[in-house]
Amino acid sequence: MEWKSTTVLVVSRNGKTVMAGDGQVTYGNTVMKHGARKIRKIGDGQVLAGFAGSVADAMALFDRFESKLKEWGGNLTKAAVELAKDWRTDRVLRRLEALLLVADRDNVLIISGTGEVVQPDDNVAAIGSGAPYAIAAARALIRNTDLDAREIVEKSMQIASEICIYTNGNITIEEI
């Protein structure tokens, strides 16, 4: 059976960066956990990080990413590129199955094990099974309302949880 889970969304707007993750972990056709924590602050509280995929793999990548952040003096983009290079070329790391979503006040990045570091044009990004729904909702709210980043994230995650069966409404939110 396959573990399925997660929607993690980040929105950066008007000087605020807000990330949210749902709490559901699904194994096959069974919900195993409702309150998983898939996001956290790292880098002395200046960086938000979330994951989709294997929890053990994500924790290993969080630790490595935090080391890269320290090594590169908090430069999010450089740390992300260096992690992606290691992840792609290291034989052990290459086997890790996770996606990372990281953000600071200025940058939003998705990091994958294939060496990709993607910076969205509009500072809105999501990973996981509910990502398309969360991104669509966030972009619609950004384009048509004056809501702040936190309100956009809350409403978008609620919408994603109503559509994606692998996403629940038990949302954890972090803000910088």
From Swiss-Prot:
Keywords: Allosteric enzyme, Cytoplasm, Hydrolase, Metal-binding, Protease, Sodium, Threonine protease. Pfam families: Proteasome. It is found in: Cytoplasm. The keyword Cytoplasm applies. The active site is at T6. InterPro entries: ATP-dep_Prtase_HsIV_su, Ntn_hydrolases_N, Proteasome_sua/b, Proteasome_suB-type. Na(+) binds at S161, C164, T167. Its EC number is 3.4.25.2. A double ring-shaped homohexamer of HslV is capped on each side by a ring-shaped HslU homohexamer. The assembly of the HslU/HslV complex is dependent on binding of ATP. HAMAP family: HslV. Protease subunit of a proteasome-like degradation complex believed to be a general protein degrading machinery. This is ATP-dependent protease subunit HslV. It comes from Pseudothermotoga lettingae (strain ATCC BAA-301 / DSM 14385 / NBRC 107922 / TMO) (Thermotoga lettingae).
